[in-house]
């Protein structure tokens, strides 16, 4: 472990030196990439240096304790030794976690897609509620949510919502939300008080840079139309809404929330790029023999990941067998109650894998 940490520290120093060079400073793309790398390395290096310093202090304190004759001083030194011995295991655990291979998409912004599944109107209502919960959660994380497309349900709610979430390490947390979310509750229109079950599908896709993927324009069909509001009525006299269809795959993307056609066209292509990259990533994952060890669930939109039982205010995450009775808090934005245990479980499994290797 320590040889790896030494290598990380060496790379940190290299990047720091490179950022001082005029040729790097004048190349904004390279400069931003190195600054991002420096930030990631610094998190590890600071903990490593703290660990190293406290290890040295512990050794010195133990030597001092052996040589010290004064009873009062010996007691003070013992307290210092006790504190250091209590702190070091936690720092060592932090370092082990920091060395877990990182998902290359973790730092990326995301495209969030929520679609009503089985359950008709009730599914559409929950899709909208789930999105609002994510918006509140994003706010607590300092992220920005921007609506891309919204299709209203027949009785309110949403048949489909597409939004972008931008900020610090969005995908690293939101990726755990991909899959089928099942809701159990009594609809307001249900006179007999029977519990209905409905589903909502969530897809979280990492955004990609335009330069990362190339699409021949002959493979794309672009259509323009007027933006539609509630009930399908036109809300724009100009054809600002844009639909982009990728002919080889059949991927169909529509954007209408932007004020101009150019804005909607740009966003539509960003979503298309992200979806095409996701297809490539899924192919690569299927070829890997240890996919299930490297992630919690497949992230596949057909996988049932969670059940929300409103009568019992209970949420169960089926991937790790987690059950909590804090449904109201979660739907108000406290998704960390679910996401943080998922991250901790992933880290524990990854550490087991490192030990067995």
From Swiss-Prot:
Q: Which SUPFAM superfamilies match?
A: Release factor
Q: One Pfam annotation, family name? A: PCRF
Q: Which InterPro entries match?
A: PCRF, Pep_chain_release_fac_I, Pep_chain_release_fac_I_sf, Prokaryotic/Mito_RF, RF-1
According to its UniProt record, where is this protein located?
Cytoplasm
List GO molecular-function terms, semicolon-separated.
Answer: translation release factor activity, codon specific
Q: Where is the signal peptide?
A: none
**Sites bearing N5-methylglutamine, chain numbering:** 233
Q: How is it modified after translation?
A: Methylated by PrmC. Methylation increases the termination efficiency of RF1.
* Keywords carried by this UniProt record: Cytoplasm, Methylation, Protein biosynthesis
Which stretches are annotated as coiled coil?
none
Name one cellular component (GO) term.
Answer: cytoplasm
The answer on whether this UniProt entry bears the keyword Cell inner membrane reads no
Gene3D superfamilies reported for this sequence: 3.30.160.20, 3.30.70.1660, 6.10.140.1950
In UniProt terms, what function does this protein have?
Peptide chain release factor 1 directs the termination of translation in response to the peptide chain termination codons UAG and UAA.
Q: Which family does it belong to?
A: Belongs to the prokaryotic/mitochondrial release factor family.
- Name of protein: Peptide chain release factor 1
**Organism from which the protein derives:** Bdellovibrio bacteriovorus (strain ATCC 15356 / DSM 50701 / NCIMB 9529 / HD100)
């Amino acid at each position: 472990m320590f040889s790896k940490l030494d290598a990380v520290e060496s790379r940190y120093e290299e990047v720091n030196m490179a950022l001082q060079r005029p040729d790097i400073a004048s190349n904004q793309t390279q400069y931003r990439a190195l600054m991002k790398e420096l930030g990631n390395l610094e998190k590890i290096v600071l903990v490593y240096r703290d660990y190293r310093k406290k290890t040295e202090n512990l050794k010195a304190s133990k030597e001092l304790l052996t040589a010290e004759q004064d009873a009062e001083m010996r007691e003070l030194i013992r307290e210092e030794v006790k504190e250091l011995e209590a702190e070091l295991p936690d720092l060592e655990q932090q370092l082990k976690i920091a060395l877990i291979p990182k998902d290359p998409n973790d730092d990326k912004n995301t495209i969030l897609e929520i679609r009503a599944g089985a359950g008709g109107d009730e599914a559409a209502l929950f899709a909208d509620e789930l999105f609002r919960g994510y918006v509140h959660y994003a706010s607590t994380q300092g992220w920005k949510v921007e609506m891309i497309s919204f299709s209203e349900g027949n009785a309110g709610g949403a048949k489909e919502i597409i939004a972008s979430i931008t900020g610090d390490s969005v995908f690293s947390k939101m990726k755990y939300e991909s899959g089928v979310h099942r809701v159990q509750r009594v609809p307001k229109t249900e006179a007999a008080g029977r519990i209905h079950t409905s589903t909502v599908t969530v897809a979280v896709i990492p955004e990609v840079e335009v330069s990362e993927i190339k699409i021949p324009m002959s493979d794309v069909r672009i259509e323009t139309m007027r933006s539609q509001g509630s009930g399908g009525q036109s809300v724009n006299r100009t054809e600002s809404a844009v639909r982009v269809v990728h002919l080889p795959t059949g991927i169909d993307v529509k954007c209408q929330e932007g004020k101009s056609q150019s804005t909607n066209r740009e966003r539509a292509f960003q979503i298309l790029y992200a979806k095409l990259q996701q297809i490539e990533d899924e192919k690569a994952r299927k070829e890997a023999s240890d996919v299930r060890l490297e992630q919690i669930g497949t992230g596949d939109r057909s996988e049932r990941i969670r059940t929300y039982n409103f009568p019992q205010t209970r949420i169960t995450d089926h991937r790790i067998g987690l059950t909590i009775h804090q449904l109201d808090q979660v739907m108000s934005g406290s998704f960390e109650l679910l996401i943080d245990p998922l991250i901790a479980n992933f880290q524990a499994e990854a550490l087991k894998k490192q030990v067995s290797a």
